[in-house]
């Protein structure tokens, strides 16, 4: 691949395939990670852990990965939408590369939160000192996980703001669409930033992915609920 040609391209088309491929791989990694975690849990039954505790942990993992999939699909849709309708520039190409790199870090961070939270939840095999250390580690990893979404939404917002600023198109409908989308992304950014701060105080264990769940549910809200109504005011 000739990077200079892609970075200097006058349209976003060369990036579409790369975007689709990267986000598809990220989602595939989530699909691979979930069965691995479930197998780990099932093996604990032989060590004397109750079936109810294992079943509860499995349900938590399934919900956690569902919310992660919702968020990654949201990023994919926003990013691809931008590249599909906007003229490419060196700035947008470089920011896109950074976003894709950050996106590739999401699966391992999600896996680590799930992996260590299941150890914390099934605490029969850990003493109090180990639990305290594990709790601190989960909080750090969770902050990194939510922090990735904060940075990615911020970079997406920067892409839209820059396009609004430099766009020479006279199509008012196009500019309004950019403006409306950028404001919706700004609410996602603020929500993720708020949850990053709140995640420092939310318990771990079965509630480890609660910030991720809140963020995913926020993205599922209709834009009219928090976007266009506020924009119109």
Task: Please give the residue ranges for each predicted region.
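Multi-pass alpha-helical transmembrane bundle typical of ion/small-solute transporters
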Residues: 2-233
């Amino acid at each position: 691949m000739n990077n200079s040609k892609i970075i200097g391209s006058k349209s976003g088309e060369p990036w579409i395939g790369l975007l689709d491929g990267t986000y598809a791989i990220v989602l595939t990694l989530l699909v691979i990670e979930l069965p691995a975690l479930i197998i780990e849990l099932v093996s604990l039954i032989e060590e004397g852990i109750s079936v109810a505790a294992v079943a509860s942990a499995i349900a938590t993992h399934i919900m956690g990965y569902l919310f992660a999939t919702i968020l990654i699909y949201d990023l994919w849709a926003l990013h691809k939408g931008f590249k599909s309708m906007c003229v490419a520039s060196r700035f947008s190409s470089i920011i896109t590369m950074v976003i894709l790199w950050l996106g590739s870090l999401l699966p391992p961070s999600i896996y680590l939160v799930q992996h260590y939270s299941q150890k914390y939840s099934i605490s029969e095999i850990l003493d109090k000192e180990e639990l305290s250390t594990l709790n601190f580690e989960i909080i750090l990893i969770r902050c990194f996980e939510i922090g990735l979404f904060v940075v990615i939404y911020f970079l997406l917002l920067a892409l839209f703001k820059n396009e609004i600023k430099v766009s020479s198109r006279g199509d008012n409908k196009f500019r309004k669409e950019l403006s409306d989308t950028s404001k919706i992304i700004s609410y996602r950014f603020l929500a993720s930033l708020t949850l990053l701060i709140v995640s420092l105080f939310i318990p771990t264990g079965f509630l480890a992915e609660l910030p991720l769940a809140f963020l995913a549910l926020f993205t599922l809200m209709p834009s009219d609920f928090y976007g266009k109504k506020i924009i119109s005011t």
